């Protein structure tokens, strides 16, 4: 018998099993393909589950959309702190006499328009005090004619407004809001809304007529405090028929009407939440009433001071940003403390153009 070498023996053995092994491999190939596909699908499913469980806070920064900048839809521009009244609870007092040059104020208003502003509200202080209302009138006309803002409004105590102002600028103004805290003249004097022999309530009625004559929507603002919280104003408000009656709860702001550096001491005017709610309940039949508690006031207004700085009131004081004239609107508004959700919740966005109000003049 022939004796085979190891190499020859291995070759002979391979030739014997080649066909069976080939057949076995062909039968196993589909199984291997199926197993590979199955494991790939399982791994993919596991990765997706892990992404879901991670949540939005654990996603990669590069996959997150950056937060959208706040849009200054409605801005309150307190261009002056000077006033001819001495309301005891005033929360924007005469701490400076500064007023921007007219062209600088216009530049700032243009920046706000470019950032998305739709409504501008001019306030103070008393806005009609500067240049006998001419400074204000020119800003009103600029905002309506050149910036084409849907809404231009003013908040005033009404004591310095003359009919000639309506003749010159009334067509450019959408809403005039007059501050009136009481229909009892003695209470007005006690609060600080008095000026010699002038009657605040009689002047209010005259302004209502002018607004009707010159097609300006009429609004009333009232601050509810210790001296008027028990008053019933239902009949008087209904007779004046404003488009809105804003009812504010007396608010303390450190450095303005309370604290060491304050020019007012408003603590004696403050009322509790329950007292404020009782006042609202007493006037629930007044359809134009728009209530605003302290919390809504602090967080839901974009307030611009005389230097065009946004004021953050969230901590019970006014912390200013840098001026929009220096850093732009998008950067300054980051420090405004503005709560857009609260702004919408309190009804901050409403029909505010007199063209859309469809009033019966």
Curated annotation (Swiss-Prot):
GO biological process: CD4-positive, alpha-beta T cell activation; CD4-positive, alpha-beta T cell differentiation; defense response to virus; innate immune response; negative regulation of protein secretion; negative regulation of viral genome replication; positive regulation of immune response; positive regulation of T-helper 2 cell cytokine production
EC category name: lyase
Membrane topology of this protein: Peripheral membrane protein
Activity regulation, per record: IRAK1 and TRAF6 synergistically activate RSAD2 increasing its activity with CTP as substrate about 10-fold.
Record's note on what induces expression: By interferon type I, type II and bacterial lipopolysaccharides (LPS). Little or no induction by IFNG/IFN-gamma is observed in monocytic cell lines. Induced by infection with hepatitis C virus, yellow fever virus and Sendai virus, presumably through type I interferon pathway. Induction by infection with human cytomegalovirus (HCMV), stomatitis virus (VSV), chikungunya virus (CHIKV), Japanese encephalitis virus (JEV) occurs independent of the IFN pathway.
Keyword Glycosyltransferase tagged: no
Bound cofactor: record note: Binds 1 [4Fe-4S] cluster. The cluster is coordinated with 3 cysteines and an exchangeable S-adenosyl-L-methionine.
List of residues binding [4Fe-4S] cluster: 83, 87, 90
Alphabetized InterPro entries for the sequence: Aldolase_TIM (IPR013785), Elp3/MiaA/NifB-like_rSAM (IPR006638), RSAD2 (IPR026372), RSAD2/Viperin_antiviral (IPR051196), rSAM (IPR007197)
Sites of the Glycyl lysine isopeptide (Lys-Gly) (interchain with G-Cter in ubiquitin) crosslink: 206
Ranges of residues in domain Radical SAM core: 69-289
Subcellular location: Endoplasmic reticulum membrane; Golgi apparatus; Endoplasmic reticulum; Lipid droplet
Presence of keyword S-adenosyl-L-methionine: yes
Keyword terms of this UniProt record: 4Fe-4S, Acetylation, Antiviral defense, Atherosclerosis, Endoplasmic reticulum, Golgi apparatus, Host-virus interaction, Immunity, Innate immunity, Iron, Iron-sulfur, Isopeptide bond, Lipid droplet, Lyase, Membrane, Metal-binding, Mitochondrion, Mitochondrion inner membrane, Mitochondrion outer membrane, S-adenosyl-L-methionine, Ubl conjugation
Assigned EC number: 4.2.-.-
Cofactor section: [4Fe-4S] cluster
Modified residues (N6-acetyllysine): 197
Catalytic activity: CTP + AH2 + S-adenosyl-L-methionine = 3'-deoxy-3',4'-didehydro-CTP + 5'-deoxyadenosine + L-methionine + A + H2O + H(+)
Protein's job: Interferon-inducible antiviral protein which plays a major role in the cell antiviral state induced by type I and type II interferon. Catalyzes the conversion of cytidine triphosphate (CTP) to 3'-deoxy-3',4'-didehydro-CTP (ddhCTP) via a SAM-dependent radical mechanism. In turn, ddhCTP acts as a chain terminator for the RNA-dependent RNA polymerases from multiple viruses and directly inhibits viral replication.
Additional detail: Up-regulated in atherosclerosis. Latent viruses like HCMV may be involved in atherogenesis by initiating local inflammation. This may induce up-regulation of antiviral gene RSAD2, which modulates lipids synthesis, and thus could play a role in abnormal lipid accumulation leading to atherosclerosis.
Domain notes per entry: The N-terminal region (1-42) is necessary for its localization to the endoplasmic reticulum membrane and lipid droplet.
Subunit annotation: Homodimer. Interacts with IRAK1 and TRAF6. Interacts with FPPS. Interacts with HADHB. Interacts (via C-terminus) with VAPA/VAP33 (via C-terminus). (Microbial infection) Interacts with human cytomegalovirus/HHV-5 protein vMIA/UL37; this interaction results in RSAD2/viperin relocalization from the endoplasmic reticulum to the mitochondria.
Family: Belongs to the radical SAM superfamily. RSAD2 family.
Protein name as it appears in the record: S-adenosylmethionine-dependent nucleotide dehydratase RSAD2
UniProt lineage: Eukaryota, Metazoa, Chordata, Craniata, Vertebrata
